[in-house]
Amino acid sequence: MTNPVIGTPWQKLDRPVSEEAIEGMDKYWRVANYMSIGQIYLRSNPLMKEPFTRDDVKHRLVGHWGTTPGLNFLLAHINRLIADHQQNTVFIMGPGHGGPAGTAQSYIDGTYTEYYPNITKDEAGLQKFFRQFSYPGGIPSHFAPETPGSIHEGGELGYALSHAYGAIMDNPSLFVPCIIGDGEAETGPLATGWQSNKLVNPRTDGIVLPILHLNGYKIANPTILARISDEELHDFFRGMGYHPYEFVAGFDNEDHLSIHRRFAELFETIFDEICDIKAAAQTDDMTRPFYPMLIFRTPKGWTCPKFIDGKKTEGSWRAHQVPLASARDTEAHFEVLKGWMESYKPEELFNADGSIKEDVTAFMPKGELRIGANPNANGGRIREDLKLPELDQYEITGVKEYGHGWGQVEAPRSLGAYCRDIIKNNPDSFRVFGPDETASNRLNATYEVTKKQWDNGYLSALVDENMAVTGQVVEQLSEHQCEGFLEAYLLTGRHGIWSSYESFVHVIDSMLNQHAKWLEATVREIPWRKPISSVNLLVSSHVWRQDHNGFSHQDPGVTSVLLNKTFNNDHVTNIYFATDANMLLAIAEKCFKSTNKINAIFAGKQPAATWITLDEARAELEAGAAEWKWASNAKSNDEVQVVLAAAGDVPTQEIMAASDALNKMGIKFKVVNVVDLIKLQSSKENDEAMSDEDFADLFTADKPVLFAYHSYAQDVRGLIYDRPNHDNFTVVGYKEQGSTTTPFDMVRVNDMDRYALQAKALELIDADKYADKINELNEFRKTAFQFAVDNGYDIPEFTDWVYPDVKVDETSMLSATAATAGDNE
């Protein structure tokens, strides 16, 4: 049921829109506008039955009116279209600050009361409904996860089209009217979102109808698209691959019923064109259509007072938030509010008991076709577990035969093979997204069973590889689009992963933050939202091996962003460091089974050793961290002189090389590897973290700990501040030093190289005793750097090192040239 077919999608209407429906839509618009104002302004007396006084007005007036009446108008017509066509539909509200429209909609269609039975369909329930909006102990101001029917909060603007198109992928019956605010249209992500129509197929995917809500103003400025000429505006959308329609209303004295008739007729014309596109695609999906889009030009704050305090309000930026900010404090503003609310004639819309009259809702859809009840907008309801192949078949087994530390393997290639077979087993519910980096990040085994979906013309097979009009891989050079597509794909019940160069995950820091907030709200207080599949993000081409790029591409700091989400036991973020290919496989298996998470998986793509077996990886992953007993030489914590800890593939490599040298000196140590970073956090802050007892047993209670960490050192310092023995931790991480240089030089400039780590370990044990050795190591670092400067490659003592337990198999070793692989093969 992952892609449920609801109703009878893509059927044209064989009759005109009825006059009863026209009248019903006008009543809906009036009642929704009234309820939207009530949510912003009223705390009591919701129908103004009792003497209406300033005491009925909230003390703090919070919310946004400007976009709301236009949204209410559109929702009336979308509801009518769903009912008349029995069309499976999810609604995207780009200007999510029009939240009163979304909550009013779900109250009117009945789903709000079904999910929140205390909000009854009577006057008492209406009062609670009004009072709770943007109120202490109440609900947020936006189209938040608390609202039935929402998959897009619209808080941070820019992602409406990304979410709309992600929702329709592999969902051929789904129609997504996507409202885009004309202010939102100025954001970067939205600007590139128009190109999404080249990445879907009308045969195998659904249809998005972009609706530009062109009300002319933002918070305090006009919008760009509202001020360009009609010709330029229409040419812009034609250039984006759309067939633009335009509807204009609200700027004269046209009767509202006439406006509804005009819009209903236009909406039918547009939907007929969509049905024709769907029908044609069944026999020809190679010709990309020009999809319809709608420019909806109406006044900002439509139907509010035209002037307040002598200043133009309707049709201006002054209508953006709360037009009557002093409605409680001044009689003049209160009287204007009263007249405004009375203008909707609530007595014609509500029964005596406060319930909404039947003739207001008669035209609306029923059952799961209701916007608030559509299972696609509560994806956990329809989510099915992935059919995962057995992981053992992808294991790098050479480590068993040749020893820990064997080989030179590009870890993500194993993940690519795993994803290939997941797609094979789940051909319409698993996707891979990438910003032109799927091959670069070594996931190209997926092309053995699928293609990159691309509906934008083809040239010679000499240059257009692995491309087709259908496929489970989607690439666009936009991290925003990749994250947005995946989020919506998950929110509508499916599964997936996307990969990015580590430094450029920062492009979508705030998107991760927004999605985390959605998940946090869900797991805390919205039990009716069923768990969705996790955002899985492969973070590769990382700071330590950005071989083809330089300082601009070296920033592992997304770890710090995600760590800010770990303090309330919501458990919506995970940070995993894959030591090698087998660990990456174990992590992927766990992530693909998980729900309601953001899983950031750090794994380098360059050839590297395989340190542990798959069984060892699974055991370590379960614990979050583990001692590598085969690498330790201390028999007990009492015997330990220093703990050598690492998180990340390159830090692990350098710690292991340092341990080899320290072992030859007779130093007693234990080696600890950390895969699940958040398990280090104080168990007082995180009830899934390891206990203090386990922490002390792993890292010792009183011995020095040298921790080589993939990202910024303060991450670890912040996590362990309340842990036993934290004062004895020395954390070495990325120090904001780098360039396009050799692997040794990259770790050298950040004091992460094996020689610096060996010297630091000796310093922690007894700086005076080992002063000569420390000096010798520092001098060798200079020699090794000079070798790289003179020759352009690293010194053999660095590149040729192999862990001593390895039975060297020459066929597993790569030359220095091969060990720096390209970005696109």
From Swiss-Prot:
Transmembrane segments: none annotated. Disulfide bonds: none annotated. InterPro entries: Phosphoketolase, THDP-binding, Transketo_C/PFOR_II, Xul5P/Fru6P_PKetolase, Xul5P/Fru6P_PKetolase_C, Xul5P/Fru6P_PKetolase_CS, Xul5P/Fru6P_PKetolase_N, Xul5P/Fru6P_PKetolase_ThDP_BS. Its cofactor is thiamine diphosphate. One of its GO terms (molecular function) is aldehyde-lyase activity. GO terms for biological process: carbohydrate metabolic process. The keyword Secreted does not apply. Its EC number is 4.1.2.-. Keywords: Lyase, Thiamine pyrophosphate. Pfam families: XFP, XFP_C, XFP_N. Belongs to the XFP family. HAMAP family: Phosphoketolase. PANTHER family: PHOSPHOKETOLASE-RELATED. This is Probable phosphoketolase. It comes from Bifidobacterium animalis subsp. lactis (strain AD011).
